[in-house]
C-alpha cells in the first residue's frame, strides 16, 4: 500500500508539472468517468495446465484531467475491473492431475492508478480521433477456485500497469465531450504460492491479467 501511495504522489506531481507548464494557455480542468466491457487474454492455470478463457467484465474509471493545449491533454484516473473471471472445465495436463477433467476459476481484483496522456490526431467538424497511453501502479490479487484442495486467495501484489488507447470524441454541449475508445491494459501478474495437494507441493497463482476494453466515457469541464 505504501508503494501505491508513493507512486500516486509521483503521478500527481507529474500532472501538476504539466499544468504549470501550460498555465499561459487558456485551458481548463475536466472530470471524467468511463465504463464499458472488457475481456481478459487467455491464460494457463499453473497448477493444472488448463487453458482458461475470459467471461465479460466491466471496466470503470474515474479521473481528473487538464487540457494542456488544444490537441493535448493529460489526466489521472483511478480504475477497476468488475466481474471478470478466467475459467474453464477441461482436461488437466500437469502432474498430479493428468488424465482428469477439472473445473478451474480465477477471479481477479484489480485497482489501478494511472497517469495518462492523449493527443488528437485529427479534428473534424463533428468529432476528433485520438491516441494515448498511461502508466501507474496497480494492486492485483485473485480468488482461485474449482479444484478441491487448491482453492485459495492470493494477497495483493503491487505491479506497474500500463495502457494503450485509441478512440474518438465529440462535443455534445458546452464543456461536455463524450468518447468511444478501445484500450489494451496490462496489470501484471498475481502472487504465486504453494499449497499441499495429496502430499505434494503444487504452485498456484501467478496469473497475468491483460485486458481488451471497449468503453464509453464523458468529460465535464470544470
From Swiss-Prot:
GO terms for cellular component: cell outer membrane. Keywords: Signal. Pfam families: OmpA_membrane. Residues 1-22 form the signal peptide. Gene3D superfamilies: 2.40.160.20. Adheres to biotinylated epithelial (Vero cell) proteins. This is Putative adhesin RP828. It comes from Rickettsia prowazekii (strain Madrid E).
Amino acid at each position: 500500500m505504501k508503494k501505491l501511495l508513493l507512486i500516486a504522489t509521483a503521478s500527481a506531481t507529474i500532472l501538476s508539472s504539466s499544468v504549470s507548464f501550460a498555465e499561459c494557455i487558456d485551458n481548463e480542468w475536466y472530470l471524467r468517468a468511463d465504463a464499458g466491457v472488457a475481456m481478459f487474454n487467455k491464460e494457463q492455470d499453473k497448477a493444472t495446465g488448463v487453458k482458461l478463457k475470459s467471461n465479460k467484465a466491466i471496466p470503470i474509471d474515474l479521473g481528473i484531467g487538464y487540457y494542456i493545449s488544444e490537441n493535448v491533454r493529460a489526466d489521472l484516473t483511478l480504475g477497476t475491473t468488475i466481474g471478470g473471471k478466467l475459467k474453464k472445465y477441461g482436461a488437466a495436463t500437469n502432474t498430479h492431475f493428468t488424465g482428469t477433467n477439472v473445473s478451474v476459476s480465477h477471479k481477479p481484483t484489480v485497482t489501478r492508478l494511472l497517469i495518462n496522456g492523449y493527443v488528437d490526431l485529427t479534428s473534424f467538424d463533428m468529432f476528433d480521433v485520438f491516441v494515448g497511453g498511461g502508466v501507474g501502479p496497480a494492486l492485483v490479487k485473485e480468488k482461485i477456485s474449482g479444484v478441491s484442495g487448491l482453492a485459495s486467495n492470493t494477497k495483493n501484489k503491487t505491479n506497474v500497469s500500463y495502457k494503450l488507447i485509441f478512440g474518438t470524441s465529440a462535443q455534445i454541449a458546452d464543456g461536455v465531450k463524450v468518447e468511444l475508445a478501445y484500450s489494451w491494459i496490462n496489470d501484471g501478474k498475481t502472487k504465486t504460492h504453494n499449497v499441499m495437494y495429496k502430499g505434494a507441493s503444487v504452485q498456484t497463482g501467478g496469473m497475468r491479467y491483460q485486458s481488451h476494453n471497449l468503453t464509453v466515457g464523458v468529460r465535464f469541464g470544470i
